[in-house]
Regions:
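Alpha/beta-hydrolase-fold enzymes
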Residues: 115-228, 232-233
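Gly/Pro-rich cap/lid or specificity-loop segments adjacent to the active site
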Residues: 1-163, 232, 236-531
Length: 531
């Protein structure tokens, strides 16, 4: 009852993490810094369970929680009935300090999403080949940029290869980044920079784990740094004084450049290192004070750990590059009674309410109840992410919706239908990212989000995904699966004024939207890919 949140002002209220500010936090914590370790936290949990006489428990951990849960399992296996690791990575071993699975999983994320998308898979090459020209342009010609995030807050930054790396590795916003990077990169090379710059601005917000008032009680940046520097494997020896550690760091990177320069391909090691410290990892702790001999960093040596026979389920999403499938497999292999479950089209963490499907939650609950997962067919039935086919500044650049029986609208009006539906999709993909409930359109207008008993409602006000079409109306969507509906009023593009009703089903692969309405006095009856 006397514990409190770790508050390092130099991190908690910093605009950007630096090696110096992380080191200053360690100095502020002083002799107590090594005590904020996962090992001691796991021991505390065991003491609480003993005091409460709860017997064996079922322990669930996600993301960093999987690290904590594994530490608890190897130190206190007698307390466990079952273990679930959702979005898991191993305690260490081998080259893990370099995060070697990080970049391959990032490449797979975009390539798999493209292969599963009808519009993207029709293009020649892989998604990474679609993105490569934008990377080359940013690498050769970085520039000062400004763009608004989804809330309308402007951000100034240098648009360069490292900013693109942050978008692609950071997965924040998770859905929008997978959905848009391929098309945004193609648009960037074609002269429309805004979609990619918007993603860069949004990612600056998304990779910041602090809440808006930067309260350490909600997220402690100091604790995150202390745990990283005390527990995680590093490319240098944390027992060295910081000055010697920097020399060791530089030597290790020089060797890596010579022996495995493609570790973070398509980005160089230097471009990777210029991402935020807590996403690139390898430089974050170089200045952290040396721990005392009594409390050495990384005390849980992976080579000497004995993993228990506890029934263990590892859940991984095959579009998750933060805790890749390969890392989940490595964690599963350590447990004699471990099993990995891969959720197709799953992102980072798949059993919590905001995941793309309820499959992970269903299987985890079944595992906890019965110690078996049973039928796992749902893991292969999660629908692919619906990628943006292309970005367009003007309606006439888009493919028209497909006319159905009873349609009287011409191709121009059917292109306006496509633009309107893509406008809905653009806002909907950001609905869960808006903390205050209000957002702005790519090229103008606003929208708001309110939760309903079964999902959420978007209210669009003159929302512009293209420059020449404003969309106003409401969108009703379920959280995951079920019927969705949009009632829209269009204004702008030639002869596109009018109203549309759009209906589709969420939670289905290859979902199709049906559209009815009147545009410019012509009846619309059409279909196209769901937003």
């Amino acid at each position: 009852g006397r514990s409190g949140a770790v508050d390092c002002p130099e991190l908690q209220r910093a605009t950007t993490l630096t090696e110096a500010s992380v080191a200053a936090c360690g100095e502020r914590l002083g002799p107590q810094a090594p005590l904020y370790s996962t090992t001691l936290a796991a021991d505390d949990l065991a003491a609480l369970l003993d005091a409460l006489a709860l017997g064996r428990v079922d322990l669930y951990g996600d993301s960093y929680g999987t690290f904590f849960a594994q530490v608890f399992a190897v130190r206190h296996p007698e307390h466990l009935r079952s273990l679930v690791l959702d979005g898991a990575y191993p305690l260490g071993g081998g080259e893990y300090a370099w995060y070697p699975a990080y970049a391959p999983a990032m490449r797979d994320k975009f390539n798999l999403a493209c292969q599963r998308s009808p519009s993207c898979s029709r293009l020649p090459g892989s998604s990474m080949s679609h993105i490569e020209p934008a990377l080359q342009s940013l690498r050769a010609h970085p520039f000062a940029a400004q763009a608004d995030d989804v809330s309308g807050t402007p951000h100034k930054f240098t648009a360069d290869a490292s900013q693109l790396a942050t978008v692609m590795f950071g997965s924040a916003p998770a859905l929008a980044s997978v959905r848009e990077v391929d098309a945004a990169a193609r648009a960037f090379v074609a002269g429309d920079q805004l979609p990619l710059l918007r993603l860069m601005a949004e990612t600056q917000v998304g990779v910041d784990s602090r809440d808006e008032d930067q309260a350490p009680l909600k997220f402690s940046a100091g604790l995150a740094a202390a745990v990283m520097c005390q527990d995680a494997p590093q490319i240098y020896d944390m027992s060295l004084p910081p000055a010697q550690r920097r020399i060791a760091r530089d030597q290790a990177i020089e060797r890596r450049e010579a022996q495995a320069h493609g570790t973070y391909a398509p980005f160089t090691i230097g471009e990777y290192r210029r991402m935020p410290l807590d996403y690139a990892f390898i430089d974050e702790c170089v200045g952290w004070p040396s721990p005392p001999a009594a409390w050495p960093a990384g005390r849980l040596k992976t080579g000497t750990v004995s993993y228990p026979n506890t029934p263990t389920l590892i859940v991984s999403g095959d579009l998750d590059n933060m805790t890749p499938v390969a890392d989940g497999a490595a964690a599963a292999a350590n447990f004699p009674n471990g099993r990995q479950l891969v959720i197709s089209n799953g992102l980072h963490v798949n059993a919590l309410p905001r995941s793309r499907s309820d499959c992970g939650a269903i299987l985890v609950r079944r595992f906890i109840e019965t110690l078996a997962v049973g039928d796992t067919a749902c893991a292969q039935a999660v629908p692919p992410v619906r990628l943006v086919p292309r970005f367009a500044r003007h309606v006439d650049e888009l493919d028209p919706a497909v006319a159905l029986a009873g349609n009287a609208a011409d191709a121009a009006r059917l292109r306006a239908v496509s633009a309107a539906v893509l406008t809905v999709g653009d806002a909907a993909s950001r609905a869960t990212e808006i903390s205050k409930g209000d957002g702005v359109g790519l090229r103008g207008g606003t929208f708001s989000v309110t939760e309903t008993p079964t999902g959420y409602r978007l209210t669009l006000r003159e929302l512009r995904w293209t420059e020449d079409l404003a969309v106003t109306g409401t969108v009703e969507r379920p959280f995951r699966a079920g019927p969705a509906k949009a009632v829209l009023s269009l204004r702008g593009a030639a002869a596109a004024d009018g109203t549309l009703e759009v209906q589709w089903s969420e939670g289905m692969p290859a979902a199709v939207a049906s559209v009815r309405g009147m545009l410019g006095g012509q009846a619309v009856v059409a279909r196209l890919a769901a937003p």
